[in-house]
Each structure stands twice: as structure tokens, then as C-alpha cells.
């Protein structure tokens, strides 16, 4: 009975947030104000919504005093909250980072980290994403893997938490600040994933974390609140002049984060933000607060389509890739914004990039990407940065005609290249390409060179591949190749993608001739 009422209340709450009107609120608020005051300490905001529709029609149905009283609503929501925490807390773990000294030994050597009595100095939270021992957390909590050991505490109620040494890092992604670790544990309970695209401000969420408590007592702590805001930006460092592929260090600096008033302490990075259906809709992160946001606000990485794609790659030990368009963009003028115009103003189109191939021009205003509205340049780079490399994107463009007439709106399609993402140590990715004769090849747009805009004026970026790295003293090194070189041809075959380059060189034995964009030709000897 209580469970059904809880579901009824939850459905009502969600409908009310999307369908309520000012007139209904005004009409009913006065009549229920005394009840709201009495219960607000238990369920702030929630009971108001229940009582607001107390006896009012909702989508053809009614919820009146005979069906759910105020006290029953409180008990139903309390039961729902307790049940949600009980179902999801078993999927939340603690992660300890133990520093090594100069000799490579752990500094905290007085107590064995595998002992239940060991409590680490540095800790974070993680979420189980596979019963075979895969744990998701934030990339930034790992620090320097060569300087630290890692241990994971898993809740084993009614016993104290079991502790496991991390076997390896499956893969990490600095762009989305996600990482997946592997521990030697089985029969874990994966966290169900929800859909953050369904979130609205005011929805109820529960934050699960407290790694110190998990490690000490085997217990997860819970706090609750509402979704305070959506698409918030993490503070960013100063942008390089001209923007470019390295303008933002993280996708979340462009406006993706969920903001909640649920209390998040330091150490809760990598914890779960769940809805009342027991689904994770965000991965909590303290990074935004550390970079200068208000302490009272909590932030979480949304569980959206990009999150799911990245998670699938990380679980498989792969680094995900992300799209690159090839424009420098800025905001519209203040006059345009005051007139209600929105979009990203294209300042420059880099030759040989997807933007040039699609037909974009300087002065164009991009207003949508794949039907998602674009309000400014951050919005443009956010939507492009969510896409995988080689994805086709639909761009809605506003173009000013030569003669001062009404701007023309039309659609373009671009096939994205690959953007540069901060390089990571080889041990942080299990499935990484094996260098060919010491040569690691990438998309020409994914090298991270600071002067890509200048190089695009003299190098055909759409008709070459780039040299990401060269192993010292390898055949490629001895031939004179270095990181940042661009390769046009393998023998007499043109190459424009790393996969094509690999197919061509793998089919050849003995010396292989490469033509470079700087008009050099080198010969790579067999190993």
C-alpha cells in the first residue's frame, strides 16, 4: 500500500513540475500553507507539490485527501527514499590513493592497506559499473599513477568493507573527466544508469558517497536535495589566444554539469547522484568547487548519451574520441544579443577542415547542432565536443547576404575530424595502438599543436595524417621523423586517416617510403 502510494506521489511530483501553472499555485498555496510549514523540514519543496495538487485534477486523474493525506505523503516519500538508498548504496565504493616515496615504497607503511584498520590520507569515491570488478570514478582523482598505489573498499554488509588492491586502470578520458579501474572482485552490484536528459530543475536527487565512512565502517553516507540548475560550467583556465582545439581542457568547462543543493564534501568525487527510481543520473565531482565555485553547491557529470558512449569505451580499455569542426568562433555583438539573437559567430574557417568542406564561411552564425540550440561559442564547441570523430552533424546556419537584406537560414552537414585531448601515460589505457616501426599516427587535427590555424594555411589537413609520437632510436626516428610532422603519402598512395595509413604500411615488407607535407621524403627501414 505504502509503496504504491510512493509511486503515485512520485508520478504526481514529476508531472506537477512540468505541468503546474501560476494560477493553480496561487489558488492552493494559501489553503495548504499551514500543512506545508509543518512538513517542510522533512521534505522541503516536495510536500508543497503534493499538497498543491491535493484535490486538483492532473492529466485526467485525481489525487485528493481521501487517497493521500499529508502524513501519508510524508511516509510514502520517506519509504521511497529509504528504498532507493538501500538499492543503490551497495554499488558505491571508496578509493584510496596511497603515495609512494622516492624508493617506490608506500609512505603509509605502518598499517597494511589491505587491513580493515587502514584509513588513507587521500580518498575518493567510485561507482561499480560491472559485476566483474569495474569501477567508475573521476579521472582527476587518480593523480600521477606512477607515484601512487590505489585500493578500493567495497561494502559487504553486515560485515566491514572488503578492501582490494587495484589491478589496473582500464582507460581514462581527461576530456570528460572519467576513468574506469579494475579490481579483483566478483559478484559486485552494478549501478543502474538513468537518463539525465529527462532532468528538470526542482527534481529530487540523492547523493551517495563519503569514502572515509565506507573505508572505516563499510557504510555509504547519503544526502538529498533537488536539481538546482543544469548545463553549468566548470571554471576554466585562461583560453589561448585564438581558441583552437586546446581552448578548453574539459567538456564540462563548456556547460554540462548538473548543480544540486545536496551536500557534497571533498572526497565525494566519483560518487553517485541518483533519482528516486534508483538510477544514477550523475557522477558527483568536487572539481568544480575546487576551481572556485560556491562551496554550498554540488556538481555532477550528467549521465547522457556522451557519458554512456565514453563509459563503454573505457570499460573496453579504449580511449574515446571526440569531434573537431575547424572553426574559430566568438559571441554575437551586444546589440544582436539585446535583439534576442543567439548563436556562435564564425570568425575563421580553417582550410582543410570539416568546416571548410561543409561550406561554412567567415561571418556565418551557427544556431543549431543536430537540432540542439546553440546560444554562444561555448555551446557550439560543447555540442561538437560531445560527438565522436567521423560523426556527421547537421548545422543550422544564418548567413548575412552581401546586400543588406534579411539573413538567410539554411542547413549544412559536416563530417567531423578528431579533436586533440590531453595525452595520458600508456599505463592508463589498456587497448592502445602499437607503434609501427616506432611511429604513432593520428588525425592531422588531433596533434595538439599550438599553431594549427597557422599550419592549416600551408598544410592540407584533409589530405594527410599527423605524427603523434616517435619512439627514440626506432626506425622512424632514425629516418628523421618527429612528432608534429604530417604525412601525405605511403609510397604512391594518399592517406587522410590513421586507419588507412595502418592498412597501407601493414601490407608492405621491407623499406617503406613516406612523403611528408614539408616536401621531404623519408624511407623507414624494417625493424
Residue ranges: model-predicted function:
Residues 433-462, 467-475:
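Extracytoplasmic/periplasm-facing segments of secreted or lipoprotein envelope proteins
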Residues 363, 484:
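Conserved catalytic motifs of ABC-family nucleotide-binding domains
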Residues 55-66:
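Signal peptide processing junction and immediate N-terminal pro/mature segment
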Residues 518-526:
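Short, low-complexity, Pro/Ser/Thr/Gly-rich segments in the mature regions of secreted, periplasmic
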Residues 513-516:
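Short, exposed beta-strand-loop hairpins at the edges of beta-sheets
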Residues 64-358, 368-392, 398-436, 509:
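Serine-dependent protease modules
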Residues 43-57:
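Bacterial N-terminal signal peptides
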Amino acid at each position: 500500500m505504502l509503496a504504491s502510494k510512493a509511486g503515485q506521489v512520485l508520478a504526481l511530483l514529476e508531472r506537477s513540475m512540468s505541468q503546474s501553472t501560476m494560477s493553480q499555485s496561487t489558488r492552493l498555496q494559501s489553503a495548504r500553507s499551514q500543512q506545508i510549514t509543518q512538513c517542510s523540514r522533512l521534505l522541503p519543496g516536495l510536500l508543497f507539490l503534493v499538497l498543491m495538487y491535493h484535490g486538483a485534477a492532473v492529466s485526467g486523474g485525481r489525487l485528493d485527501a481521501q487517497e493521500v493525506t499529508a502524513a501519508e505523503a510524508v511516509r510514502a516519500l520517506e519509504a521511497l527514499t529509504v528504498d532507493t538508498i538501500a538499492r543503490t548504496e551497495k554499488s558505491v565504493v571508496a578509493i584510496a590513493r596511497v603515495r609512494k616515496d622516492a624508493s617506490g615504497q608506500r609512505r603509509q607503511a605502518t598499517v597494511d592497506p589491505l587491513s580493515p584498520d587502514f584509513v588513507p590520507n587521500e580518498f575518493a569515491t567510485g561507482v561499480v559499473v560491472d559485476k566483474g570488478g569495474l569501477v567508475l570514478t573521476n579521472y582527476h582523482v587518480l593523480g600521477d599513477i606512477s607515484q601512487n598505489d590505489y585500493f578500493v573498499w567495497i561494502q559487504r554488509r553486515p560485515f566491514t568493507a572488503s578492501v582490494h588492491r587495484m589491478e589496473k586502470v582500464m582507460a581514462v578520458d581527461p576530456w570528460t573527466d572519467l576513468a574506469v579501474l579494475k579490481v579483483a572482485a566478483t559478484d559486485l552490484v552494478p549501478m543502474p544508469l538513468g537518463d539525465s536528459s529527462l532532468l528538470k530543475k526542482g527534481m529530487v536527487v540523492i547523493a551517495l558517497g563519503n569514502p572515509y565512512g565506507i573505508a572505516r565502517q563499510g557504510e555509504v553516507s547519503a544526502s538529498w536535495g533537488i536539481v538546482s540548475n543544469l548545463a553549468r560550467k566548470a571554471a576554466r583556465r585562461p583560453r589561448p589566444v585564438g581558441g583552437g582545439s586546446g581552448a578548453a581542457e574539459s567538456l564540462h568547462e563548456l556547460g554540462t554539469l548538473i548543480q544540486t543543493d545536496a551536500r557534497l564534501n571533498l572526497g565525494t568525487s566519483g560518487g553517485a547522484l541518483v533519482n528516486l527510481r534508483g538510477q544514477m543520473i550523475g557522477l558527483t565531482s568536487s572539481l568544480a568547487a575546487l576551481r572556485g565555485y560556491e562551496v554550498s553547491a554540488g556538481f555532477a557529470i550528467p549521465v547522457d548519451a556522451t557519458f554512456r558512449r565514453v563509459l563503454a569505451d573505457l570499460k573496453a580499455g579504449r580511449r574515446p574520441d571526440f569531434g573537431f569542426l575547424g572553426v574559430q568562433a566568438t559571441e554575437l555583438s551586444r546589440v544582436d544579443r539585446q535583439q534576442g539573437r543567439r548563436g556562435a559567430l564564425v570568425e575563421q574557417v580553417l582550410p582543410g577542415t570539416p568546416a571548410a568542406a561543409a561550406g561554412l564561411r567567415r561571418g556565418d552564425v551557427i544556431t543549431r547542432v543536430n537540432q540542439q540550440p546553440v546560444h554562444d561559442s561555448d555551446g557550439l564547441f560543447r555540442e561538437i565536443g560531445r560527438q565522436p570523430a567521423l560523426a556527421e552533424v547537421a548545422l543550422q546556419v544564418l548567413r548575412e547576404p552581401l546586400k543588406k537584406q534579411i539573413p538567410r537560414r539554411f542547413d549544412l552537414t559536416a563530417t567531423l575530424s578528431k579533436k586533440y585531448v590531453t595525452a595520458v601515460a600508456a599505463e592508463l589505457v589498456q587497448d592502445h595502438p602499437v607503434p609501427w616501426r616506432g611511429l604513432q599516427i593520428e588525425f592531422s587535427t588531433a596533434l595538439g599543436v599550438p599553431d594549427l590555424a597557422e599550419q592549416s594555411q600551408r598544410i592540407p589537413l584533409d589530405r594527410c595524417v599527423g605524427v603523434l609520437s616517435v619512439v627514440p632510436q626506432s626506425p622512424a626516428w632514425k629516418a628523421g621523423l618527429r612528432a608534429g610532422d604530417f604525412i601525405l603519402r605511403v609510397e604512391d598512395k594518399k592517406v587522410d586517416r590513421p586507419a588507412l595509413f595502418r592498412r597501407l604500411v601493414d601490407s608492405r615488407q621491407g623499406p617503406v617510403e613516406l612523403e611528408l607535407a614539408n616536401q621531404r621524403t623519408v624511407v623507414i627501414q624494417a625493424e
